[in-house]
């Protein structure tokens, strides 16, 4: 996953805006709702890469 990628969290697509370093315990990501622009923080383990196929 890279900044700017579309990812899936709780069944919805979000834009990945930030990642905590791999060395951080309980790593989190920052996500942006592409429809509203609202930002969310989510556990890294709950976010998956979007597959287009």
Task: Tell me what each language-model feature is.
Residues 22-23, 45:
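Coiled-coil-like amphipathic alpha-helices with heptad-repeat character
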Residues 12-22:
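Short beta-strand-centered aromatic/proline hotspots
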Residues 25-30:
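Short aromatic-glycine-enriched beta-strand elements
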Residues 1-10:
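Short coil-to-beta transition motif at edge beta-strands of beta-rich domains
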Residues 8-9, 22, 33-34:
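Acidic surface patches and DE-rich sequence motifs
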Residues 32-53:
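Intrinsically disordered, low-complexity, charged/polar segments
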């Amino acid at each position: 996953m890279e900044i700017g990628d579309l990812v899936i969290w709780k069944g919805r697509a979000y834009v990945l805006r930030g990642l905590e370093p791999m060395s951080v315990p309980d790593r989190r990501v920052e996500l942006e709702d592409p429809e509203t622009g609202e930002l969310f923080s989510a556990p890294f383990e709950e976010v998956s890469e979007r597959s287009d196929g």
